[in-house]
Amino acid sequence: MDYLILMICIVVSGLLLYSSRTSKMKLPPGPPGLPIVGNLFDLGSLPHRSLAKLAKLHGPVMCLRMGRLRVVVISSDSAAKEVLQTSDTLFCNRFVYDSLTASQHHTFSMALLPPTALWKSLRKISASQLFTNARMNASQHLRRKQLEDLLSYVESCSRSGTAINIAQAAFNTSVNLLSKTFFSVDLIDPSSSNSVEFKEMVWQIMLESGTPNLADYFPVLRRIDPQGNRRRMKIQFEKILDLFNTMIRQRLDEKGGCFDEINDTLDALLKINQDNSEELDLSVIPHLLLDLFVGGSESTSSTVEWAMALLFSNPEKMKKAKEELETVVGKGIAVKEEDTGRLPYLQAAIKETFRMHPPTPFLIPRKTDSDVDLCGFTVQKGSQVIVNAWAIGRDPSLWENADTFEPERFLGMEIDVKGRNFELIPFGAGRRICPGLPIAMRMLTLMVANLINCFEWRLEGGAAPETLDMSDKIGFTLQRAHPFRVIPTSIIQGCDVSTALNN
């Protein structure tokens, strides 16, 4: 009995001390929650929109309770700057969803690792081997070849009157660009059903990453994985990792361990491993490639689809983009990489697409390992911190007519997407900014420019552009709720696509 009384006293004392400590903190405001589940039912099926509405009531730094998890939601450019830049070192750790622990991916992933020696090594390799300006310029011929394949495919659909799924076509191009750069081979044949299967694998990974999971909100449930998110994620991870491991083994056999001649990214990575396995262990390489393929292909293809849909559903904006292309490049002539810097209206349309439909509306969540002061509030240790880039892009205090597609707003405005302007952060900012930004911007700009300069488009059934459904859905990336399917009519000048591109 005395022991029981002692234990009760200890527990009560602990609760009183915790209550006293938290009462002295100024915690971020937020909506009241239900017992046990907290604010879980406030998210709905479109959490980026639900949280933006709640932020209008409770402020740009808002705290919700999702089961046992505290979630701090950032919905203003100034607060985002504090998290991503000013106090970056205090918010640099990642909150790892339970599904992403499948196949131990979180222990190798550049996107998910805390800022450890391995993370620093992977960032260094990305900066020096994958996405330097010199490497980007050296691989222009690869992008030209993939663009030629895309335009040839669209041209063939034009001749047959076949509707094109823009996201699927852009996805195929993105994957093959990355696979050419990394492995010197194409992973996808646009006319093959394998392309649909590969995209489905990537989408399932994005979907499982973004689906609310009880195991994230009630850690005691992680052991049993009640919704099966981690089990389903492991299936998709293993398929892609097995593919990459097979390609690595084949390359090692081909090279016989000699990597004096570097032909592609895989050669470069294997040489780093050969020279210093402590800098890059062989087991890390498939996970690095998984991050780059999944993040790069899906975000690029979804942005191309949104940009095309926005221009198509706003005929006056499409007309301006086409007139600029006709003036700078020539109507029906394939756009080259060096042309894109002379297309300010098209660049503005891409930025406006990012503003309205950022590919990852919550970026990648952060986690605090200690109590942190933020904008006059205390963010408690162990909190998940998410930046609602979608809400910032729709903030009427930052953007006039925030829900209207107006590329003109960016003309003459010194705002870019490189993490320096926190009104527009589709790739994040600070030291954890997306490393694939350079190649993503080059490729998606080229795809959009050529699709609108070399083809006219119409909806199936002859529906008017203004009737296009612009609703969205969310996995980890922001997708169109309904695929953008349109029928092309070629206006390519010259005898064929290859000639047009190489003139």
UniProtKB/Swiss-Prot annotation:
Q: What are the protein's GO molecular function terms?
A: heme binding; iron ion binding; monooxygenase activity; oxidoreductase activity, acting on paired donors, with incorporation or reduction of molecular oxygen
Gene3D superfamilies named among the record's database cross-references: Cytochrome P450
CDD domains recorded for this chain?
CYP76-like (cd11073)
Which EC number(s) does the record attach to this protein?
Answer: 1.14.14.72
Positions that bind heme? S471
Q: Does the keyword Ribonucleoprotein apply?
A: no
Domain of life of the organism encoding this protein: Eukaryota
Q: How does it sit in the membrane?
A: Single-pass membrane protein
Tell me the PROSITE patterns matching this sequence.
CYTOCHROME_P450 (PS00086)
Q: Which residues cross the membrane?
A: 7-23
The cofactor named in the record is:
heme
Q: Which UniProt keywords apply?
A: Heme, Iron, Membrane, Metal-binding, Monooxygenase, Oxidoreductase, Transmembrane, Transmembrane helix
Per its record, the protein catalyses: (5S,9S,10S)-drim-7-en-11-ol + reduced [NADPH--hemoprotein reductase] + O2 = (5S,10S)-(9R)-7-drimene-11,12-diol + oxidized [NADPH--hemoprotein reductase] + H2O + H(+)
SUPFAM superfamilies the UniProt entry points to:
Cytochrome P450 (SSF48264)
In Pfam terms, one family for this protein is p450
NADP listed as a keyword: no
What's the chief localization of this chain? membrane
InterPro entries named in the record: Cyt_P450 (IPR001128), Cyt_P450_CS (IPR017972), Cyt_P450_E_grp-I (IPR002401), Cyt_P450_sf (IPR036396)
Give an example GO cellular component term for this record.
membrane
Which protein is depicted? Drimenol monooxygenase
Organism of derivation: Persicaria hydropiper (Marshpepper knotweed)
